[in-house]
Design a protein with these regions (language model features):
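Anionic-ligand binding region
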Residues: 116-150
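Hydrophobic faces of well-ordered beta-strands that scaffold small-molecule active sites
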Residues: 5, 53, 81-83, 104-106, ...
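Alpha-helix N-cap and loop-to-helix initiation/capping positions
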Residues: 33, 60, 120-128, 166, ...
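Auxiliary Fe-S-binding modules of radical SAM enzymes
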Residues: 141-251
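Conserved radical SAM core fold
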Residues: 25, 62, 87-90, 108-126, ...
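Non-cysteine beta-strand/loop elements that form the S-adenosyl-L-methionine
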Residues: 98-112, 185-194
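Conserved Radical SAM active-site core
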Residues: 1-103, 112-114
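Alpha-helix-loop-beta-strand connector modules within alpha/beta enzyme cores
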Residues: 68-80, 131-139, 212-220
């Protein structure tokens, strides 16, 4: 109740070496369901008091999702649809979601193509993500809230950036681009919960949490360049206990 109604989809277009949800990203977790059942799940989450429907890594199931949302809306689904994505998506896919998605929650992971090639096997990630986010912002425009900025978002785009160990220069380039391109049209979430798991052992430079100094350096930069609509994190979040188990609950 009073939380995000997360619906995780199996599979991911990216193959990040530091993936926190590897069992679902590589398609080994999950359950096959019908479009009709997906629509029912959306309605069940609304009935339980969810504030929104949060579609996590949904890109490969967009046609089915569109049908499921339409079915659910015909049965009184009212809460916002959130599209939670790595941004490694075809622009035509995003365009097809106009009128379906209310809130976009994209990542902008890398500015430097060498980093995206090394850590996500996607040298074209920066250019693909730019185009995808541009289409998302075109659709939503500036954020709209229920009752002012302290209330729930009804429509808008929140771009997330996870700082990687030793990559503050790249993080600053991402933030500068987003601010210079979109200004206060978007919200930016600067995240520090990078959690080194066994999958980064071949990448010793990633085999640590980011330091408090690294995070503060990036946040200070965001303030200095004039970012006003932003979210920052406080406290310790880089723990394996924060990574969800996927047991098909609710499916």
């Amino acid at each position: 109740e009073k939380g995000s109604g997360a619906v995780f989809f199996s599979g991911c277009a990216l193959h990040c070496v530091f993936c926190q949800n590897e069992n679902i990203a590589n398609g080994t977790a999950g359950k096959v369901i019908s479009t009709e059942r997906l629509g029912e799940i959306f309605l069940e989450l609304q009935e339980k008091g969810a504030n929104n429907i949060n579609l996590v890594t949904p890109g490969q199931f967009v046609p089915q999702i569109i049908k499921a949302v339409e079915l659910a809306r015909n049965q009184n689904l009212k809460i916002p649809i959130v599209y939670n994505t790595s941004s490694y998506e075809n622009v035509d896919t995003i365009r097809s979601l106009e009128g379906i998605v209310d809130i976009y929650l994209p990542d902008f992971k890398y500015w430097n193509a060498a980093l995206s090639a090394k850590y996500s096997h996607a040298p074209d990630y920066p250019s693909v993500a730019k185009k995808a986010i541009e289409e998302m912002v075109r659709q939503t425009g500036a954020a709209v809230f229920e009752n002012g900025e302290d209330s729930l978002m009804k429509c808008g785009t929140i771009v997330r950036h996870l700082i990687l160990p030793g990559c503050t220069k790249d993080s600053k380039a991402v933030l500068r681009y987003l601010h210079e391109t979109y200004g206060n049209q978007i919200y930016i979430s600067i995240m520090h919960q990078f959690t080194p798991l066994s999958n980064v052992e071949k990448y010793p430079e990633l085999n640590r949490k980011i330091t408090e100094r690294e995070y503060e350096d990036v946040v200070d930069f965001a303030v200095d360049i004039g970012i006003e609509n932003g979210f920052i994190q406080e406290g310790e979040t880089a723990e394996e206990s924060f990574i969800p188990e996927f047991d098909n609950e609710g499916v």
